[in-house]
């Protein structure tokens, strides 16, 4: 069944408890941002909205002061407007204990969670938007097993404490402001088992954690093939990085203002540019992995020098400084126990009829997308 709003207002306004909206095609809402013209506006509790197609609607599903609702397996797209003029796919405002599960979102603006806590956001796919997921002042939410591709920013948390980000894939957050996962004044978070790949910035950390006596934990994440693996916007502390895998990033770490990231804990991470050995074969490097600020990082503090990034001239200057430094370079970070034996459980080797060893292909990063280049084809194994 199709419900067409005729280009005015919201298609359905759900101001009740315990209703079910399913298997509908909701289309052609109004285009007024101030009225939040939506496919479904929810103003109640214990409702179920599932298996619907919502298209040509400014906003998709808008929940305000609504609790214990289920939003599941909906296909949502916005109006055919410029990115900033689209509406949000799913919007939670002062809404608690909701479950946002298994939705497919394309060509919208953001998914936003504002002033909302104890929500579950799981198994969703978001493509071609601005913010795949944007938190503000929202505590104790769970973000698990989602896929974000070709968005300006994958996930961004502002002033949102106690959030768990687990087993998500964030890729192709490109452009000047492209960030896989970003944190601003956010505390007590757990970021584990995520894949953050092919983005301008993998992780961006700004004054996080913010609350006193709190710690942010980053564990077993793959941060690979980004322009910058981790960017610190300040000389901050109390982040713990353990058993993460930094691979194929142009720069592993960037600290603005010429500061250091060594006030954080770095332990047992894999760095593909580690230059040490493992003579006792315990899987741990015999010497620490140190990252110093040499001339190859001048572009981070002098914007005009970015023109020469990767050039032979800058590489020569960097080589000479490493060979005979004029002064002691600044230590950016030290991982005292870098790991060498990477066990990502990613590539299964099998024998074919010709007794050749070949890797099994991994799954696609997102439905409907095929690898676009050789790097992506190589990375498929890591995404299994």
Regions found by a protein language model. Give the residues of each.
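Solenoidal tandem-repeat scaffolds enriched in leucines and small polar residues
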Residues: 61-165, 170-171
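Structural detector of coil-to-beta-strand junctions
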Residues: 9-11, 32, 37-41, 60, ...
């Amino acid at each position: 069944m199709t419900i067409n709003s005729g280009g005015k207002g919201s298609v359905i306004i759900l101001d009740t408890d315990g209703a079910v909206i399913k298997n509908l095609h909701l289309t052609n809402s109004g285009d007024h941002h101030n009225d939040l013209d939506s496919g479904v506006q929810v103003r109640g509790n214990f409702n179920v909205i599932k298996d619907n197609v919502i298209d040509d609607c400014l906003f998709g599903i808008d929940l305000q002061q609504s609790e214990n609702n289920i939003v599941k397996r909906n296909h949502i797209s916005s109006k055919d407007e410029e990115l900033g003029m689209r509406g949000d796919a799913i919007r939670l405002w002062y809404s608690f204990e909701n479950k946002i599960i298994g939705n497919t979102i394309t060509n919208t603006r953001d998914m936003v969670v504002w002033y909302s806590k104890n929500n579950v956001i799981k198994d969703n796919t978001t493509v071609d938007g601005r913010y795949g997921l944007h938190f503000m002042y929202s505590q104790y939410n769970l973000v698990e097993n989602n896929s974000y591709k070709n968005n300006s920013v994958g996930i961004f948390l502002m002033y949102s404490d106690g959030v768990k980000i687990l087993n998500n894939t964030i890729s192709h957050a490109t452009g000047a402001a492209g960030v896989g996962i970003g944190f601003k004044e956010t505390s007590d978070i757990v970021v584990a088992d995520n894949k953050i790949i092919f983005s301008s910035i993998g992780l961006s950390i700004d004054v996080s954690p913010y609350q006193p006596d709190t710690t942010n934990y980053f564990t077993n994440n793959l941060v690979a093939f980004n322009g910058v693996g981790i960017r610190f916007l300040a000389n901050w502390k109390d982040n713990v990085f353990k058993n993460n895998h930094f691979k194929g990033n142009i720069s592993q770490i960037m600290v603005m203002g010429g500061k250091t990231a060594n006030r954080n804990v770095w332990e047992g991470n894999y760095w593909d540019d580690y230059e040490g050995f493992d003579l006792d074969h315990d899987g741990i490097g015999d010497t620490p992995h140190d990252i110093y600020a040499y001339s190859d990082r001048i572009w981070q503090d002098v914007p005009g020098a970015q023109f020469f990034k990767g050039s032979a001239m800058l590489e020569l200057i960097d080589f000479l400084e490493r060979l005979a430094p004029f002064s002691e370079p600044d230590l950016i970070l030290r991982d005292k126990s870098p790991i060498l034996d990477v066990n990502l459980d990613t590539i299964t080797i099998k024998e074919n009829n010709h007794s050749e060893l070949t890797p099994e292909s991994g799954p696609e990063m997102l439905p409907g997308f095929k690898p676009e280049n050789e790097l992506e084809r190589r990375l498929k194994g890591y995404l299994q």
